[in-house]
Regions:
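Conserved N-terminal catalytic core of the sugar/cofactor nucleotidyltransferase
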Residues: 2-5, 13, 27, 31-103, ...
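Left-handed beta-helix
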Residues: 180-330
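A structural signal for short hydrophobic beta-strand segments in well-ordered beta-sheet cores
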Residues: 25, 138-140, 210
Length: 330
């Protein structure tokens, strides 16, 4: 089975961070969004991955090759953003009629990957939400099979949202339905959506069993990324390198600090993730994500996203700043 991960989006809601790095490479709880997804799938036995890249795709390609040299990886470019259905269709030559596992590259979910992979059924991940109008929505029968799928309905018939996880055995039917979308120009909000192709498959007789995820973390905007960071740090317990000594510093767990950081006269935590080789002095950092190779001096930060290679001095507020930025309030 091959994994297909669409990561071509520009992540406009996360600017300025995404001006210089793709959304999938934003760190959460000590590792990138993409690594949370790839690690989960590879640990379950998937060894071949197809990444659909676009915006800053070369950065994703470099990251994957450096981080996962033992995996078989392919990169397909989606030069025009025409939706998830269009993205998956670009992988046709690499997939053939083999089964695939599709995981959208901007969400982190907790579920038993091995159980889903080993199941003989095609399967779609779902989660109950209060307002499903911005998601694909599933109607499910009493046996757990999906009866209907609709992408972003104005009036949803259920509150079961699609979480972006799809195990598809009948890939020949999938690509047939994707082609039908293009020929008949079937779009939702101007895009060819995978949900519409899956609905077509159901109409042609394909049966999808639903599976519920334990947790579903949206990584599409600053607030949800910080919430996800806090939740995952609580679950994982964080990590602080034993060899590093932080002078006159209080660590309030859960916290994740990468190797090579210099921290002194500071209070760090709770719910803080810090990238490698960052220097923090005379500062208080809470509920924030700090990139690598960054310098913070005399700052008090709450609910902040700070990119890599940034410098912030003399500040007390919530920030969202990108890479290679220098801010001095002294």
């Amino acid at each position: 089975m091959k994994a297909v991960i669409p990561v071509a989006g520009a992540g406009t809601k996360l600017r300025p961070l995404t001006y210089t790095q793709p959304k999938a490479l934003i760190p959460i709880a000590g590792k990138t969004i993409l690594s949370h997804i790839v690690d989960q799938l590879s640990e379950a036995g998937i060894t071949e991955f197809i990444f659909i890249v676009g915006y800053l795709g070369e950065k994703i390609q470099d990251y994957v090759k450096q981080t996962y040299p033992n995996l078989t990886t392919h990169f397909v470019y989606q030069n025009e953003r025409q939706g998830t259905g269009h993205a998956v269709e670009l992988t046709k030559q690499l997939i053939g009629d083999e089964p695939i596992f599709v995981a959208l590259g901007d969400t982190i979910c907790e579920f038993d990957v091995k159980e889903i992979i080993d199941s003989p059924d095609s399967m779609i991940g779902i989660r109950k939400v209060d307002d499903p109008r911005d998601f694909g929505v599933a109607t499910i029968d009493e046996n757990g099979f999906i009866e209907h799928l609709v992408e972003k309905p104005a009036i949803p018939k259920s509150n079961m949202a699609l979480v972006g996880l799809y195990k598809i055995n009948e890939t020949a039917v999938l690509f047939e339905c994707l082609q039908q979308l293009f020929v008949e120009n079937i779009t939702t909000r101007g895009e060819y959506n995978l949900t519409d192709a899956l609905a077509c498959m159901i109409q042609k007789g394909t049966r999808f069993r639903s599976f519920k995820v334990a947790n579903w973390f949206d990584c599409g905007k600053k607030e949800s990324i910080l919430e996800t960071n806090a939740t995952l740090l609580k679950k994982m317990g964080g990590h602080v390198p034993a060899a590093d000594i932080y002078k006159d510093t209080i660590i309030i767990h859960p916290v994740s600090i990468a190797a090579g950081c210099t921290i002194s006269n500071a209070i760090i935590g709770p719910h803080v993730a810090i990238g490698p080789n960052t220097t923090i002095t005379q500062s208080i950092i809470r509920d924030s994500i700090i990139g690598g190779y960054t310098n913070l001096h005399e700052v008090v930060l709450d609910n902040s996203l700070i990119g890599s290679d940034a410098s912030v001095k003399g500040l007390s507020r919530s920030l969202n700043i990108g890479d290679n930025t220098e801010i001095d309030f002294g």
